[in-house]
Amino acid sequence: MSALSLSITKVSETFSEIYASRAQYLSGFKSVGEFLDVRRISRPRNFSEAQSRISFNFSRFSSNYLAIIAMLVIYALIRNPLLLIVIGIGVGGVYGIRKLQGADLQLSHRVISNQNLYVILACVLIPLGLFASPIETIIWLVGASCVCVFGHAAFFEPPVESAFETVEQQV
């Protein structure tokens, strides 16, 4: 009975930690109107201004940028269904093998050890994974994320109030 209460306590602690981290993450989101304010988009005069804009906007819009990257990951997986299937087979296979809890799999009069199940899963996933072109997807994802995030951060002007904040900090 104490093991059950211990696991319930651990589950409730885990959910409270997830809720707290989710609340902290969501508090960092800026509104869509503020994030996509077209009036504040301009070309930086030089590279140092672009660097300062990127630094400021990364700290200000980090949650929004993470949401954009998450949406790009979802889009990349939808765009490459074979990779999504390979990931599903891999997760399902590992889950099924772990469900055995270290015991061997018995199929009628054959016994397959736990290690052999992992080898079989790897032998199935490696060729399928190479055929699903994960490297192309990762390269596309890195490129699209950099263009979206760095492009927004470099071309989006900081608000006028931020200039006064730096002056106040220096005084």
Curated annotation (Swiss-Prot):
Gene Ontology biological-process annotations: endoplasmic reticulum to Golgi vesicle-mediated transport
Alphabetized Pfam families for the sequence: PRA1 (PF03208)
Domain of life, per lineage: Eukaryota
Transmembrane segments: 67-87, 119-139, 140-160
One Gene Ontology molecular-function label: small GTPase binding
Major location category of this protein: membrane
Compartments where found: Membrane
Transmembrane recorded as keyword: yes
InterPro entries, sorted: Prenylated_rab_accept_PRA1
Membrane topology of this protein: Multi-pass membrane protein
Gene Ontology CC annotations of this record: COPII-coated ER to Golgi transport vesicle; Golgi apparatus; membrane
Protein family membership: Belongs to the PRA1 family.
PANTHER family linked to this entry: PRENYLATED RAB ACCEPTOR 1-RELATED (PTHR19317), PRENYLATED RAB ACCEPTOR PROTEIN 1 (PTHR19317:SF0)
Protein name according to UniProt: PRA1-like protein
Phylogenetic placement of the source organism: Eukaryota, Fungi, Dikarya, Ascomycota, Taphrinomycotina
